[in-house]
Design a protein with these regions (language model features):
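Loop/turn positions that initiate beta-strands
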Residues: 200-203
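Short Gly/Pro-enriched turn/cap motifs at secondary-structure boundaries
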Residues: 68, 131-133, 181-183
Length: 207
C-alpha cells in the first residue's frame, strides 16, 4: 500500500501560538506519538513544523527567529533519536528573500511557506526596499462623508495587515495621501474612515 509521510506540528511551553491556531504535540509527547504511529503501517513521521518561526520586530526593524523555531529543531533531534527519518523541517512566517538569508544560520531548515513573500507584503516590506516588490493592493472608493471625514467601503480587511494610509483621487495625477482610521477590533469592517473629506466616488488605493 501507499505510505503517507506526515509533517507533525510541534509546540513548546514558551512558544507563541496565535488564537485560532491552537494545535500540536508538546515535546514530551513525541515519544508516545512515535510509539502509537508504529501501529499505523501506512504513515511515516517525516517532518516537523511550527508557526511562527520568524517574526518582524518593529523596534529593531529586523526579522528575528522565535522560540518556536528552537522547538522545531529540538523536535527534529528527539524524533531522530527515536528512530524517525526527518526529511522536512518547515519554519514558516515572514518568509521572503531576506528571511531565507537568515535561515542559512539554521542548516536543518528545509522549507518555509512562501505566503506574503510572493506578494512583497510582509511587515518587513513596510520599512525596507526588499527584493520583492509589493504587488497586492486593496481597492475601494469613497462612499460618503460625515463630520468632515470621508469613508470608503470596507470588507475583507485583514486585521493584522497594518494598513495606515490610502491614496485618494479620480486620476493618477490627482491622487492625495490620507491617513486611514481603522474600525475597532470587535467591529465588522463595513467602512474605513479617512482623516479628511474627499469626493464621493473617488478611488481609494491601500496596501
Amino acid at each position: 500500500g501507499l505510505v503517507q509521510k506526515e509533517c507533525e506540528r510541534v509546540i513548546g511551553e514558551n512558544d507563541r501560538i496565535y488564537s485560532g491556531q491552537t494545535a500540536g504535540f508538546y515535546l514530551n509527547q513525541l515519544e508516545e506519538l512515535v510509539q502509537k504511529s508504529k501501529d499505523l503501517k501506512y504513515i511515516e513521521i517525516a517532518g516537523v513544523d511550527n508557526f511562527p518561526c520568524f517574526l518582524y520586530d518593529e523596534v529593531t526593524k529586523e526579522i528575528q527567529a522565535q522560540e518556536n523555531l528552537h522547538t522545531v529543531l529540538k523536535a527534529k533531534k528527539i524524533l531522530e533519536e527515536l528512530g524517525c527519518f526527518i526529511q522536512n523541517v518547515n519554519a514558516p512566517s515572514a518568509t521572503c528573500v531576506h528571511t531565507l538569508e537568515l535561515m542559512k544560520q539554521y542548516p536543518e531548515i528545509t522549507s518555509a511557506e512562501p505566503g506574503h513573500g510572493f506578494s512583497g507584503t510582509t511587515p518587513y516590506h513596510v520599512d525596507h526596499d526588499a527584493e520583492e516588490i509589493p504587488s497586492v493592493l486593496y481597492l475601494s472608493e469613497v462612499s460618503h462623508v460625515l463630520d468632515n471625514h470621508a469613508y470608503i467601503y470596507g470588507g475583507g480587511y485583514y486585521r493584522r495587515g497594518h494598513i495606515q494610509n490610502a491614496l485618494i483621487g479620480s486620476s493618477y495625477e490627482g491622487l492625495v495621501k490620507d491617513s486611514v482610521i481603522l474600525p475597532d477590533m470587535d467591529s465588522i469592517d463595513y467602512h474605513f474612515g479617512l482623516e479628511n473629506p474627499h469626493h464621493i466616488g473617488d478611488s481609494a488605493v491601500l496596501c
